[in-house]
């Protein structure tokens, strides 16, 4: 009797061990994504609709319908080894109108996608003295070794009017 109980006990322990050797039907997650810092200076021009110029004038800010832009883009690109589409997250801080002795701050938070060939599209909120709006941007990044030169066009429609920008700059591709 003792031997039978001992055998049943050992058999009971062996069943869970056997269950552990079976391959479970679990999806293995992909390897972690890598991020690349693509931060760098940005500069360009912005065309302001008359409504935006008037809105700024109401706030005692007098500028013409075309202003220069200078600033910095803080960008992180998330990619995988497959070389497919990459996701990006960026904050763009610009000062506009410096050539007119005015400093118009602008802050945009953009999220978007970039193709392996460098074509990109992003969307996100934009805040300026003219108000809050949703920015839409698209462009292409030209690459030469580690040097990247983005050419970006942005459209920012708002209640006050529309802003259209063309920005460029550069950054050095560096893994973080």
Language-model-detected regions and their locations in the chain:
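Mid-length scaffold segments of soluble, non-membrane domains
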Residues: 81, 90, 94-120
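Residues that define the transmembrane beta-barrel architecture of outer-membrane proteins
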Residues: 64-70, 103-107, 128-134, 147, ...
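Short glycine/proline- and aromatic-enriched beta-strand/turn motifs that initiate or cap beta-hairpins
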Residues: 20-71, 171-176
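Short loop/turn motifs that connect adjacent beta-strands in outer-membrane beta-barrel proteins
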Residues: 28-38, 79-87, 118, 143-149, ...
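Transmembrane beta-strand segments that form the barrel wall of outer-membrane beta-barrel proteins
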Residues: 86-97, 118-129, 147-157
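Outer-membrane beta-barrel "beta-signal"
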Residues: 160-176
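Transmembrane beta-barrel domains of outer membrane proteins
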Residues: 75-79, 112-114, 139-141, 169-171
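Sec/Tat signal peptide C-region and signal peptidase I cleavage site
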Residues: 15-19
């Amino acid at each position: 009797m003792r031997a039978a109980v001992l055998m049943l006990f050992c058999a009971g322990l062996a069943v869970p061990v056997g269950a552990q050797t079976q391959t479970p039907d679990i999806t293995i997650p992909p390897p972690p994504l890598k991020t690349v810092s693509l931060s760098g200076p940005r500069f360009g021009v912005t065309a302001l609709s008359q409504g935006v110029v008037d809105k700024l004038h109401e706030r005692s800010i007098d500028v013409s319908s075309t202003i220069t832009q200078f600033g910095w883009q803080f960008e992180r690109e998330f990619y995988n080894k497959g070389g497919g589409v990459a996701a990006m997250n960026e904050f763009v801080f610009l000062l506009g109108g410096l050539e007119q002795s005015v400093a118009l701050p602008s802050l945009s938070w953009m999220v978007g996608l970039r193709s392996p060939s460098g074509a990109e599209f992003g969307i996100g909120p934009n805040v300026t003295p003219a108000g809050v709006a949703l920015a839409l941007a698209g462009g292409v990044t030209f690459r030469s070794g580690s040097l990247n030169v983005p050419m970006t066009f942005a459209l920012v429609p708002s209640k006050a009017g529309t802003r259209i920008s063309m920005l460029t700059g550069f950054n050095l591709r560096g893994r973080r």
